[in-house]
């Protein structure tokens, strides 16, 4: 989502980035994913990771979520992206044949946003799931959903440390199975 917003704004589009949480960034920021495009070289994410590793403000070195959030928020604001944090998409507005806007709720009020284009960069396609487009969940080979990882963050010897712990496969749409992990 952050890279789609940044790229569109860089090309001159008026961009609104809706974020459900209080901070921007999904898997790349909050999930602290490093490396994209199956290891291909190049891309804005590489510039950002280098920028994070060169920081001298935060405890520890690396691409920590809170560092990414502050750097990316500044980058997007500087290029003119309108950041709306704390909003949940509640509906898609259609004309005869295409999506032309979104409705979103911030907990108190509903806003309506007209759009020439909508990019659904949510974790599980939350916006597309509001439409009547046929959907299919899980992998083609076995119907299983994606692996789930728990990211633990702590201080060790005065240094901020983050560890990914693979929790195995689970069905994130099953509340009982999800809550056991």
Q: What is each of the regions a protein language model found here?
A:
Residues 56-130:
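Feature captures the FAD/FMN-dependent oxidoreductase FAD-binding
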Residues 14-15, 23, 82, 134:
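Residue-level detector of anion-binding/catalytic polar loops
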Residues 1, 22-24, 34-36, 90-91, ...:
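Solvent-exposed loop/turn segments at secondary-structure junctions
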């Amino acid at each position: 989502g952050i890279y789609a917003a940044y790229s569109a704004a860089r090309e001159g589009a008026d961009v609104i980035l809706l974020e459900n949480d209080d901070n921007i960034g999904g898997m790349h920021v909050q999930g602290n994913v490093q490396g994209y495009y199956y290891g291909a070289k190049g891309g804005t994410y590489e510039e950002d990771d280098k920028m994070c590793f060169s920081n001298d403000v935060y405890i520890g070195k690396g691409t920590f979520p809170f560092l990414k959030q502050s750097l990316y928020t500044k980058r997007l604001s500087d290029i003119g992206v309108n950041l709306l944090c704390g909003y949940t998409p509640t509906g898609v507005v259609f004309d005869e044949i295409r999506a032309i806007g979104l409705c979103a709720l911030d907990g108190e009020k509903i806003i309506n946003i007209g759009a020439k284009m909508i990019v659904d960069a949510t974790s599980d396609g939350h916006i597309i799931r509001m439409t009547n487009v046929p959907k299919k969940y899980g992998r083609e080979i076995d119907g299983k959903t994606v692996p789930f990882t728990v990211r633990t963050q702590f201080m060790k010897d005065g240094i901020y440390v983050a560890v990914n712990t693979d929790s195995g496969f689970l069905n994130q749409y099953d509340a009982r199975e999800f809550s056991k992990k």
